[in-house]
């Protein structure tokens, strides 16, 4: 059985000044006087936190590599070290650690002098979850994440980060890092210490 409830009749004062209407808008009126907190993107930019997991980059060889650990990995995979080029030693640890390994396309090339270099390093960001597992797995601190979060593109092809793009993002990040020292990820030495005690079976260079 439906119970009918009689509405309370409005007084003449409530009818004239729309008091019920004003009561309904009190939340709106209250917040209308508060300072706005909305960031009007893209006209306004935000500053990501220190541990923000943004677009990926490659650190290049610039003389700041943690020694002797970096040289040990270079000798292990017989890598040719070139100043200004990626630190990657083609160990494939990033691909093995990734929940979606299909996003990585990594190839090494053997030079006539017997040394090896990374020739292909593509990352399909359409498949990436930005979990950072690949960054943690990198033994030479080559792969890392920056504060870049504007990664929209018009085509699927533009969503693939090539080796050249990763190196360029890395150079730009290092230059900005000098001006913004507070926004720094885990230090190179700390990561190398973590991997120094890891007894994971490594693949042979010819298997990479």
Swiss-Prot record:
GO molecular function terms attached to this record: 4 iron, 4 sulfur cluster binding; iron ion binding; NADH:ubiquinone reductase (non-electrogenic) activity; quinone binding
Cofactor(s) demanded: [4Fe-4S] cluster
Keywords: 4Fe-4S, Cell inner membrane, Cell membrane, Iron, Iron-sulfur, Membrane, Metal-binding, NAD, Quinone, Repeat, Translocase, Ubiquinone
Reaction(s) this enzyme catalyzes, per UniProt: a quinone + NADH + 5 H(+)(in) = a quinol + NAD(+) + 4 H(+)(out)
Topology class, membrane: Peripheral membrane protein
SUPFAM superfamilies: 4Fe-4S ferredoxins
Subunit text: NDH-1 is composed of 14 different subunits. Subunits NuoA, H, J, K, L, M, N constitute the membrane sector of the complex.
Gene that encodes the chain: nuoI2
InterPro entries tied to this protein: 4Fe4S_Fe-S-bd, 4Fe4S_Fe_S_CS, NADH_quinone_OxRdtase_chainI
UniProt domain 4Fe-4S ferredoxin-type: residue ranges: 79-109, 119-148
Subcellular localization: Cell inner membrane
Function description: NDH-1 shuttles electrons from NADH, via FMN and iron-sulfur (Fe-S) centers, to quinones in the respiratory chain. The immediate electron acceptor for the enzyme in this species is believed to be ubiquinone. Couples the redox reaction to proton translocation (for every two electrons transferred, four hydrogen ions are translocated across the cytoplasmic membrane), and thus conserves the redox energy in a proton gradient.
Record-given protein name: NADH-quinone oxidoreductase subunit I 2
Positions annotated to bind [4Fe-4S] cluster 1: 88, 91, 94, 138
Membrane-spanning parts: none
Domain of life: Bacteria
């Amino acid at each position: 059985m439906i119970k009918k409830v009689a509405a309370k009749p409005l007084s003449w004062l409530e009818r004239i000044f729309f008091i019920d209407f004003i009561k309904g808008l009190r939340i709106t009126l209250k917040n209308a006087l508060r300072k706005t907190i909305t960031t009007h993107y893209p006209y306004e930019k935000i500053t990501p936190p220190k541990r923000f997991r943004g677009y990926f980059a490659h650190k290049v060889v610039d003389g700041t590599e943690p020694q002797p650990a970096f040289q040990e990995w270079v000798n292990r995979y017989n890598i040719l070290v070139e100043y200004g080029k990626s630190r990657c030693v083609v160990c494939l640890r990033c691909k093995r650690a990734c929940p979606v390994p299909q996003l990585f396309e990594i190839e090494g090339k053997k030079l006539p002098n017997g040394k090896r270099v990374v020739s292909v390093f593509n990352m399909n960001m359409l498949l990436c979850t930005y979990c950072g597992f690949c960054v943690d797995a990198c033994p030479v601190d080559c792969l890392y994440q920056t504060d870049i979060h504007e990664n929209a593109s018009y085509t699927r092809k533009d969503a693939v980060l090539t080796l050249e793009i990763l190196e360029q993002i890395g150079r730009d990040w290092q230059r900005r890092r000098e001006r913004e020292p507070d926004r720094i990820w885990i230090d190179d030495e700390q990561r190398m210490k973590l991997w120094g005690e890891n007894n994971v079976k490594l693949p042979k260079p010819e298997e990479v």
